[in-house]
Regions:
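Beta-rich interaction/scaffold domains
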Residues: 2, 26-27
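Bacterial N-terminal signal peptides that target proteins for export
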Residues: 2-11
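C-terminal motif of bacterial Sec signal peptides marking the signal peptidase cleavage site
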Residues: 21-24
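Conserved positions within compact, well-structured domain cores
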Residues: 27-237
């Protein structure tokens, strides 16, 4: 039976971080405390928020870095639409459609070979989540059929209409970053948001998760490791 629960947004002042206190109500299980914590910085100097969801701590934005954790540059293609189908293990990052102005809001897109490179791309103390860790998030939020709505940013500032059942009650703030096919095109900007997992399916494919403007699902899919897909980092435990 579904019950109404109160969720507390606990935002407090700590050294170097200023946060605000309020509370509101939400429906459906599971309920949770949304605690916005002090910021995280990547090797490029990009700053990210972080949020507790169940037993996990997630960044609240997609990764934007152009470097591995050790400072090595991650390659890209010129032009952004270059066909990489025949490359064996391409390691690239892109702004969507080659438009650097989109990076601040939507982050970058990476091939799977980048996100599993031993040099790491998440900030120190963070990692690209496995398929099992995505499933932990999904289950905590009540299952795949409703979890997507709880992750998506509210409204149509970034999402196309109707952005069905978006509540962002988790503070995850999923945005429709689209993705890059292995041939030469960028697709589904403003309609779908997706993120890699570190778990491979076969030698050529890996698991990823998507949310859509037209449903409140979170959908596990299998894509080519050569695709450009966003990354949302998870804190090490």
């Amino acid at each position: 039976m579904k019950t109404k629960n109160r969720v507390w947004y606990i935002l407090f002042i700590v050294v170097g971080s200023v946060l605000v206190i309020s509370n509101s109500c939400k429906k459906d299980n599971p309920t949770q405390s949304v605690i916005k914590l002090s910021a995280v910085t990547d090797v490029d100097g990009n700053i990210y928020g972080k949020v507790i969801i169940g037993t996990q701590i997630w960044l609240t934005e997609n990764l934007k870095t152009t470097k591995y954790r050790n400072g090595d540059l991650i390659g890209t293609t010129t032009p952004a639409e270059l066909n990489i189908y025949d490359e064996v293990t391409p390691k690239y990052q892109w702004a969507y459609d080659g438009d650097e102005d989109k990076v601040a809001t939507y982050g970058r897109l990476y091939t799977w070979y980048v996100i599993t490179d031993t040099r790491n791309i998440c900030p120190t103390g963070w990692h690209v989540p496995s398929d099992a860790e995505w499933l932990t998030l999904e289950n905590y939020l009540g299952g795949y059929a409703i979890a997507g709505g709880k992750l998506k940013e509210i409204g149509t500032t970034h999402w196309v209409t109707p952005n069905y059942m978006a509540t962002n009650e988790t503070g995850f703030t999923a945005l429709p970053n689209g993705w890059r096919h292995i041939e030469d095109i960028f697709v589904n900007f403003a309609k779908f948001g997706g993120w890699w997992s570190s778990t491979e399916y076969t030698a050529t494919d890996a698991f990823c998760n998507y949310v859509s403007y037209k449903s409140d699902l979170i959908t596990e899919e299998i894509d080519s490791k050569k695709c450009g897909i966003a990354v949302r980092c998870l804190k090490d435990q």
